[in-house]
Amino acid sequence: SEIREAKRRGLKIIVGGPAAWQWLWRTDYWREFGVDTVVDGEAENVIVELAERALNGEELPLYVYVGPSDVPSIEEIPVIKGASVNGLVEIMRGCPRGCRFCPVTLRPLRFYPLEKIEKELQVNARAGLKGCILHSEDVLIYGAKGLEPNPDALLKLHTLVKKYCRTLAWSHVTLAEVRYSQERYRLIDKLAEVVYDEYQDWIGVEVGIETGSVRLARKIMPAKAAPYPVEIWPEVVEEAFAIMHDHRIVPAATLILGLPDEGEEDLTATLELLDRLEGYRSLIVPMFFVPLGALKDRRWFLREQLNELHVEVLKKCMWHTVRWGEDIMSKLYLRDLRYAPVKMLLKLFLAYVKRKAREAERVVEEMGLERVKRGVAIAPTPASDQ
């Protein structure tokens, strides 16, 4: 291939990014893909030296970890030189909530000034981009003191973005901040007034539910509900979902299955919370626990560890997401006539997903979960061919 030929001529490959930690679990891929160095963490203070060493033909380290004390200051983070993917614009780095499964909370909180954000918006605008994704672990604490929202900073930020972009989205917000900022400041109302216009009438965002269990929340993410007590975490989640539903904010929510010390009562609590969220427009995506952050010494959760309650959570998430996915697609997404072919393809895809989901449910019911986990070959049932 061209890359292998270039490697023979001295090409060096340095990789990084948010998922760089995954290379540590598949070191065999380093040789397969010819990777010379993996940078795990914020790279601004190390990448120039690595590039210089590569250009000079010097030996490169296999792995570079950038710890919390070595992250760049805002002044050391350069403005982007070319258009970003999907119009992504960073507004801050770090997170103060301290969830034990998340590596971002290990890094200090730093806010980009509006002047720096505007320069990146201008780079994207010059490239013809008309949309923007504001990137942060929690957009609603931009400019905050601790976890206390700063309405003035947020309103100025969104007003600035709408000056350059027709549409915007949020990469992440926390559910506690959605509820608190609306209850205390009516901030979601005010932001909607700034954002919604002839070009945009909804916002997409990723949020983290992670678990419906108060017991687990207390152990692994005690500040996730702050400023509310963690004991009312399910109520915080439901109220935030209600606020987002009323304001046409569409969350893609994550759940984590297989958290350390997870028991049947925790999964039952998650199922009960999912029942409470049925009426709120959202996508809910379950994930298996991956050892990161303060829990990086724990074991991965694997398919072989699934039990009946895990399967019930997976099923409930799947049908919730399919049902609301159809609603979102028909009422909010790709409404322009020119997107009709794409919309039709998505409808066909959802129909396929529903058919395969029903087939999978039948297989588990007929064969039993244990046989499916062992990887027993699954032959289509007569009903699945209809």
Protein language model features and the residues they cover:
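Catalytic cores of alpha/beta
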Residues: 24-33, 186-188, 260-276
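Glycine-rich beta-alpha loop elements in corrinoid/cobalamin-binding modules
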Residues: 1-70
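Conserved SAM/AdoMet-binding glycine-rich loop
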Residues: 122-251, 257-259
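N-terminal pre-triad scaffold of radical SAM enzymes
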Residues: 70-105, 111-114, 118-126, 130-133, ...
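Radical SAM enzyme core and accessory elements
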Residues: 95, 315-386
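Surface-exposed amphipathic alpha-helices with a cationic face
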Residues: 2-10, 103, 162, 241-245
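Well-ordered, non-membrane alpha-helical segments in soluble/globular domains
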Residues: 1-3, 114-118, 148-161, 184-192, ...
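Flexible glycine/acidic-rich beta-alpha junction loops that bind and position SAM and/or redox cofactors
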Residues: 20-26, 133-146, 179, 209-224, ...
